[in-house]
């Protein structure tokens, strides 16, 4: 056989080069989700300035802060279907384009109605990107799905840590909330171009349903209508209300109730993001231990921490430490494993639809989270609002998690090569 006669085709890449390209593509996708997180965490920090300029009350401000999740709700399940007709890479890029442009256009709003509309549109793009990324990482890391989602969640950690801190600095430097919004939108557009240049279909379009069965997770229900999915839907709804009650209005609580300066509030919210860095480890825990144990204990811990946040000391060190623990629990543990358990509850060919269902449930309930906690805070004070929307809902989640059946979820075959 003549080994010199046949040159490498465009589809044949030496293994070291292919590995380097894959690592670069994974890194770009991780950073792109970090930019998504930066965009999501920016507006709540700007809310005090927006309320001051436009005259919104607490409930209106709360709705404005979390209305983007309505867009995520509307886009979640349809995006799952879109991924069966278009490439995941394309869906990711279009999603980034939508939310970046909407973020920039928000600064042109003349009142409550049009700003609310622009903020909702950002959620459509963010949901498209998130749903496609969940499918990419769950499929590409099919042997360790929860750990794969945990790796993706490192992006959220970075974005959630950088976003509020950088946003507060830009707010101080430019003296207007509009400057950070425009700058973050431009960063998103740059990420869209980078993905086009770096991410290849061999990575983004991996489909475990088409692979050989050896080494692929076995089990899971053949339909979304199963006990585990129903329980996970309930948990996702409660989680969305609690998570975005915190993310949407906690910066306002810090600035208006505890009288924190913008930079201090941004630092506290950034420290929340650092708590998410344990997500790779907690994703591994989710692969190894019972979903009852992982989610039940996590919701219980979140309830205790939330109680201290809204009832305990108001000093910076205490609030920052508690926010770090809540970040590790909420976004670092519960989010990662809820997403993975949704996928593991069904067969591999339903991974995209399960991811879409997860996104829709979490962000559907989150749509009302800011309005509800803002209304309660305006009526009965921040302590009562935090106790109802975070403490009690997390306690309910801990109880409901006991209904999960880990033996009915997909699991990795013990033999391996």
What kind of feature is each model-predicted range?
Residues 290-338:
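C-terminal transmembrane helical hairpin of 12-TM major facilitator-type secondary transporters
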Residues 343-382:
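A late C-terminal transmembrane helix in Major Facilitator Superfamily
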Residues 10-18, 202-231:
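Juxtamembrane intracellular "pre-TM" segments in multi-pass secondary transporters
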Residues 75-87, 279-290, 377:
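Helix-to-loop junctions at the C-terminal end of transmembrane segments
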Residues 118-156:
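Cytoplasmic helix-loop-helix junction between adjacent transmembrane helices
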Residues 43-44, 228-279:
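Extracytoplasmic gate region of multi-pass secondary transporters
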Residues 151-199:
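Helix-loop-helix hairpin linking two adjacent transmembrane segments in secondary transporters
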Residues 74-110:
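Conserved MFS/SLC helix-loop-helix module at the cytosolic interface between two early adjacent transmembrane helices
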């Amino acid at each position: 056989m003549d080994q010199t006669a046949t040159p490498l085709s465009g589809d044949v890449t030496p293994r070291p080069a292919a590995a380097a390209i894959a690592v670069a593509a994974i890194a770009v996708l991780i950073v792109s989700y970090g930019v998504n997180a930066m965009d999501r965490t920016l507006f709540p920090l700007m809310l005090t300035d927006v309320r001051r300029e436009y005259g919104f009350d607490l409930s209106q401000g709360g709705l404005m802060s979390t209305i983007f999740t309505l867009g995520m709700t509307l886009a979640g399940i349809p995006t799952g279907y879109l991924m069966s007709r278009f490439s995941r890479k394309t869906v990711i890029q279009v999603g980034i384009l939508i939310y970046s442009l909407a973020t920039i256009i928000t600064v042109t709003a003349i009142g409550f109605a049009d700003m609310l509309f622009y903020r909702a549109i950002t959620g459509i793009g963010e949901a498209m990107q998130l749903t496609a990324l969940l499918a990419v990482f769950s499929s590409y890391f099919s042997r360790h799905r929860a750990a794969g989602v945990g790796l993706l969640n490192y992006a959220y950690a970075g974005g959630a840590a950088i976003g509020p801190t950088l946003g507060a600095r830009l707010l101080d430097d430019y003296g207007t909330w509009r400057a950070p919004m425009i700058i973050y939108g431009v960063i998103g557009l740059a990420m869209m171009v980078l993905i086009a240049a770096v991410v290849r279909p061999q990575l983004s379009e991996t489909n475990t349903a088409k692979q050989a069965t050896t080494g692929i997770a076995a089990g899971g229900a053949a339909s979304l209508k199963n006990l585990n999915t129903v329980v996970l839907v309930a948990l996702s709804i409660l989680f969305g209300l609690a998570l975005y009650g915190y993310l949407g209005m906690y910066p306002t609580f810090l600035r208006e109730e505890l009288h924190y300066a913008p930079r201090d509030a941004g630092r506290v919210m950034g420290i929340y993001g650092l708590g998410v860095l344990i997500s790779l480890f907690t994703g591994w825990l989710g692969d190894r231990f019972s979903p009852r144990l992982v989610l039940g204990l996590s919701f219980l811990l979140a309830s205790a921490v939330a109680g201290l946040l809204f009832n305990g000391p108001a000093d910076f060190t205490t609030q920052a430490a508690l926010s770090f623990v809540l970040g590790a629990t909420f976004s670092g543990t519960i989010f990662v494993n809820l997403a993975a358990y949704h996928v593991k509850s069904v067969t591999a060919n339903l991974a995209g639809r399960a991811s879409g269902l997860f996104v829709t449930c979490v962000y559907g309930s989150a749509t009302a989270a800011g309005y509800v906690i803002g209304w309660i805070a305006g009526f009965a004070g921040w302590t009562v609002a935090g106790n109802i929307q975070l403490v009690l809902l997390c306690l309910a989640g801990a109880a409901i998690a006991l209904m999960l059946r880990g033996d009915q979820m997909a699991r990795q075959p013990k033999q391996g090569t």
